[in-house]
């Protein structure tokens, strides 16, 4: 019998966890080199377990695991430190990012650049960037959404009209729609200028795309930020197959209290 595949010292984040037995958990984990995987953490619910205080969402971990089945076995987990747990709306935003990954990433499909972007957005949400404000956190979410859509092949080129491949005109208005990609906007549609879309394409192609895209979005005015958010939300909901993501609905419910 072939030896079970073992992975050591793998950078990872817990996306979701649920009960497997009275004492164990199933984890959905995003790893840097192996993508999204499922792990069983045996005994993790016991008070004496070393896993218990470590296996938390939105925290940088280093994991050891093994096995060839669809659900591998967790052998070791270490918290890598660096930031505290996000709180309040930032925590819900972190859960929102996790929900996107669970819905859009296939198992065992590595996305190293996306992993690095995820680490970046978690740091912003945790306030690692001095004086991180709501606007910075919102820009980080938009940057991550764009990078996620591109990584999974759902974002068209942002410097041409999708169906005609005609270059964008800088002062014309274009909208991003699920069925047709980027096209000229009709009156009243959420849209950005051709110059804005071209700038976004440029920063997405940067060697450090998350940071470059965050900075670009942070320079946009409130109207452009709102238009970008609405277009990306519609595109993500379409590809996730839902009208509203669970975490988005949770945010709305809390804001209505």
Curated annotation (Swiss-Prot):
Entry keyword NAD: no
An annotated GO BP: double-strand break repair
Keywords (A to Z) from UniProt: DNA damage, DNA recombination, DNA repair
Transmembrane regions listed in the UniProt entry: none
Pfam families reported in the protein's UniProt record: RecO_C, RecO_N
Name of the protein in its database record: DNA repair protein RecO
Function summary: Involved in DNA repair and RecF pathway recombination.
Matches recorded under HAMAP family: RecO
UniProt xrefs under SUPFAM superfamilies: Nucleic acid-binding proteins
Family: Belongs to the RecO family.
GO cellular component, one term: bacterial nucleoid
């Amino acid at each position: 019998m072939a030896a079970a595949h073992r992975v050591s010292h793998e950078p990872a984040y817990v996306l979701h966890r649920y009960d497997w037995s009275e004492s164990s958990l199933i984890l959905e984990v995003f790893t840097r080199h192996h993508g999204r995987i499922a792990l069983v953490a045996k005994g993790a619910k016991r008070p004496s377990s070393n896993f218990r205080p470590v296996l938390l969402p939105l925290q940088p971990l280093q994991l050891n695991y093994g096995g060839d089945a669809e659900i591998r076995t967790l052998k070791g987990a270490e918290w890598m430190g660096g930031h505290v747990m996000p709180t309040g709306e930032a925590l819900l935003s972190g859960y929102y990012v996790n929900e996107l990954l669970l819905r859009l990433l296939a198992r065992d499909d590595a996305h190293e650049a996306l992993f690095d972007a995820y680490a970046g957005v978690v740091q912003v949400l945790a306030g690692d960037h001095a004086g991180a404000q709501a606007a910075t956190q919102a820009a980080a979410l938009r940057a991550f959404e764009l990078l996620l859509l591109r990584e999974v092949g759902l974002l068209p080129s942002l410097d041409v009209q999708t169906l005609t491949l005609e270059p964008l005109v800088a002062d014309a208005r274009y909208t991003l729609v699920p069925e047709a990609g980027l096209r000229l906007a009709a009156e009243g549609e959420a849209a950005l200028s051709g110059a804005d879309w071209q700038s976004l394409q440029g920063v997405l192609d940067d060697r450090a795309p998350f940071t470059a895209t965050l900075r670009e979005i942070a320079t946009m005015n409130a109207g452009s930020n709102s238009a970008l958010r609405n277009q990306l939300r519609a595109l993500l909901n379409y590809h996730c197959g839902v009208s509203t993501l669970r975490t988005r609905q949770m945010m709305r419910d809390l804001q209505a209290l």
